Amino acid sequence: MRTYTPKPGDINRQWHVIDATDVVLGRLASQTAILLRGKHKATFAPHMDMGDFVIIINAEKVALTGAKLEQKRAYRHSGYPGGLTSVNYAELLESNPVRAVEKAIKGMLPKNSLAAQQLGKLKVYRGAEHPHAAQQPKTFEISQVAQ
């Protein structure tokens, strides 16, 4: 029996909406990365972009466990010598929660050329409103929430 390789026309993309209220950031990122890659589908192929579109709402209400708000730091570099800046997650979630969620999800995607395509299917919004109602997204529940 020959191995099935999906054709680009065989890919059926769904839209999922995830409410990030009180969901632990790592669990949210892990489940979202699985949906973006398409690993939940029976026709998954690691060399193709098989994933679905994911909308995350209420990014400002995401939870971090333990002392990560004060101890975990997000780094970025300007490209110039001495251009490394860092900020702790308490400040990052207050100023730009969308960036915090995108950074966590990007770290869980493969480090190859498909990652940019897969990240392009991710839409993160700070509040509860999103402009993708025409796509009729299905609600995706993440079972574990913060205590």
From Swiss-Prot:
Recite the UniProt keywords alphabetically: Ribonucleoprotein, Ribosomal protein
Q: Which SUPFAM superfamilies match?
A: Ribosomal protein L13
- Under the GO molecular function aspect, what terms does this record hold? mRNA binding; structural constituent of ribosome
Keyword check for Ribosomal protein:
yes
Signal peptide range in chain numbering? none
Q: Which GO terms describe its cellular component?
A: cytosolic large ribosomal subunit
- Any single biological process term in GO: negative regulation of translation
The keyword Ribonucleoprotein belongs to this UniProt entry's keyword annotation = yes
Subunit record text: Part of the 50S ribosomal subunit.
Family, per the entry?
A: Belongs to the universal ribosomal protein uL13 family.
NCBIfam families in UniProt: rplM_bact
Which purpose does this protein serve, as stated in its record? This protein is one of the early assembly proteins of the 50S ribosomal subunit, although it is not seen to bind rRNA by itself. It is important during the early stages of 50S assembly.
Q: What is this protein identified as? A: Large ribosomal subunit protein uL13
